[in-house]
């Protein structure tokens, strides 16, 4: 499985997880530039939630959350600002969903990163 398919599979898992938690998926893979992509845009109650998804096969080389660098977070924030400039949104936050697939599937939801 190539990296794009692997990433999409992780995002599919994250969407199913969010939906089970009562989130409505609004958009996926919203691109604003080469460096600025929002993986999942969802709504939970009255809050729009921008979700960065990180998926790893194992945690042998570190946990998925470690891949959310300062630069990555800055790019996510830029994407959020673009989205907010196009849409009327009162309440929002940025979350991360970190998925490790082996030895068993583990999903960690980090809110307000």
Regions found by a protein language model. Give the residues of each.
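Conserved catalytic cores of phosphodiester-cleaving nucleases, focusing on short active-site segments
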Residues: 38-59, 76
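Catalytic cores of nucleic-acid endonucleases
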Residues: 55-103
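Structural signature of beta-strand start/N-cap positions in the alpha/beta core
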Residues: 21-24, 36, 47
């Amino acid at each position: 499985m190539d990296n794009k398919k692997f990433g999409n599979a992780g995002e599919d898992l994250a969407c199913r997880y969010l939906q089970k938690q009562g989130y409505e998926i609004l958009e996926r893979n919203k691109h604003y530039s080469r460096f600025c992509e929002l993986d999942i845009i969802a709504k939970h109650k009255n809050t729009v939630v921008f979700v960065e998804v990180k998926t790893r096969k194992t945690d042998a080389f570190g946990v998925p959350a470690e891949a959310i660098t300062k630069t990555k977070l800055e790019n996510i924030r830029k994407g959020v600002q673009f989205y907010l400039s196009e849409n009327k949104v009162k309440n929002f936050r940025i979350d991360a969903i970190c998925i490790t697939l082996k030895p068993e599937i583990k999903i960690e939801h980090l809110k307000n990163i």
